[in-house]
Amino acid sequence: MPRGLLKKISLDRIFKLSKIDPWFLGQIKEIVDCEINLKKIGLPKNFTEFNRIKSIGFSDKKLSELTNLSEDVVRKKRIALKILPVYKKVDTCAAEFKSFTPYMYSTYQRNFSIVSECEAEPTSKKKIIILGGGPNRIGQGIEFDYCCCQASFSLKDAGFETIMVNCNPETVSTDYDTSDRLYFEPLKEEFVFNIIKKEQMNGNLIGIIAQFGGQTPIKLAKFLHQNKLPILGTQYSSIDLAEDRDRFRNLLNKLKLKQAESGIAKTYKEAIKIADKIGLPLMVRPSYVLGGRAMEIVYEKGQLRNFIEEAFKAAEKNPILIDKFIDHAMEVDVDAISDGKEVYVAGIMQHIEEAGIHSGDSACSLPPISIKPFLVKEIENQTKKLALALKVKGFMNIQFAIKKDEIYVIEVNPRASRTVPFVSKAKGLPLAKIASRVMAGEKLLKFNLKEKSKGMYAVKEAVFPFNKFPNSDLLLGPEMKSTGEVMGFDKNFGMAFAKSQIAAANSLPKNGLAFISLKNSHKDEGIGLAKDLIKLNFKLSATKGTAEYIRKHGMKCKIINKVSSGTPHIVDVLDSKKIALVINTGGGNSEHRINDAIALRRATLKNKVPYCTNMSTAQACLEAIKSLKTKKLD
């Protein structure tokens, strides 16, 4: 619509096309006219005009784009004219009587209220600002809001006034009683800066917590550092060191820790050069993004150009990262807390799926189910080394890959991770509360950390929105797709995994017809899988190649056609409700194989059939089925 107005399309014409009330169209036109004017004459020179522009809703960043000035210059000119936002309380009492709820929003509109202009009223207490996670989306979910809330409760108990900054009404952190004061504002530089300056007008601002809300507030760490605003916990220098590939590689070399060969590219030409040097397979991803957005595994050179271009788009002005992909490796997630001298390794989680599946989508087990004890000990040692070398204060998350008993560091995030609530529940420890107190200056030793649930297995399983999007593809990869998670808890791993599947609305069958389609490289391992299925009273069916291989090893197996081989095919059989379990690691790069695999995955989704896309998940499912058949579910 604004584009139409810029092209001089009349309001009457837009109304006829859109049916939007002309009053709203007039408001949009006012904004468009302001944009045109700003491009022509630049920033207003007087208070009245500048304040009018701000009251319409133009951010400093947008003004900088329209006037070809830096955002810093725009901010300084605005402050020089004493154009600052005022904060108003949300009227939680519907004007029936005076509202005292400290639930603030900013405005540049003035002289429209009989109450005092600014209602923020910063107190004289010692205070801590917590930056929330902003809007929920894939990769940035309620797990981070949990951390922010727990930090607020804990710091209040420790005698600090807590101030929450967030803009998502669907979160607990924006409840009126979670913090002492809430600013319902975007997690953007201008808005956060204004809030900090307002709170610094009275009392003692101890610091700003940026590491609990995920990647959104962490992106503000550089801005806070540049403006000499106090960051609580891990400092920007450490955050930047962990994100800067060249410097981080040097640190790993110094610590004698292994990492897959990698490079960082600022241009397309650099990316191609690095890719040629490292060789396939590769992991291509943008820096400073969450949820694995635009992250891809490149197996063929023909895929490279498109994936690099998409990574640069997602990275915006940041470089992209290119790593050698460690194929067929086991991935491990570690959460830890450090006070700068001591390090507590809170949880070592083994991913059920192989490396290459985003950590937010992979099921995982705490404690690990098949990692050798000496490797667990070495992971603990490497975690402690990295925490101390990075001068971490508060949370740290590390992702490792293990292949042939060698440990590789994938990445380090000096912030809270999405697994913190899971580890806290599994260990029976309020980790976010402890980390916030450590960031405020307390020592780890004070908390006498001892887990309360030894001898138990906790399994985290991702929950996906595929049932709401029937044409979506179930195949998982490095870009996150899940929108939630559940947890299974038991003394037995198989039962814990079974419980996690029940909680994720993916209940496993105890018998029936299993359908198997395997890559050639998985067929030897698949024979053991087939034998286990028969022992569990399943009958076998498979695609022609897999079925013939199973028959060679003395087992009965029904052949079912792929979709491209003609009817009746696997989708027909799934639609007839005759399949109880699908294990499909097959696929390929030819068009008909890709289409076959997509059709199979969509049919399993439509018919609510449990579906395994890799051997490790299939093995975990068999463990769970064994437990369901031999143990009582409680």
Listing of model-derived features with the role each one plays in the protein:
Residues 243-246, 289-293:
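Conserved A3 ("GATE") glycine/threonine-rich loop of ANL adenylate-forming enzymes
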Residues 69-84:
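Charge-enriched amphipathic alpha-helical scaffolds
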Residues 1-37, 41-57, 80-81, 85, ...:
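ATP-dependent carboxylate activation and anion-phosphoryl transfer catalytic cores
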Residues 76-79, 88-257, 266-273, 491-632:
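ATP-binding N-terminal substructure of ATP-dependent carboxylate-amine bond-forming enzymes
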Residues 56, 62-66:
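Extended, domain-scale alpha-helical bundle/helix-rich regions
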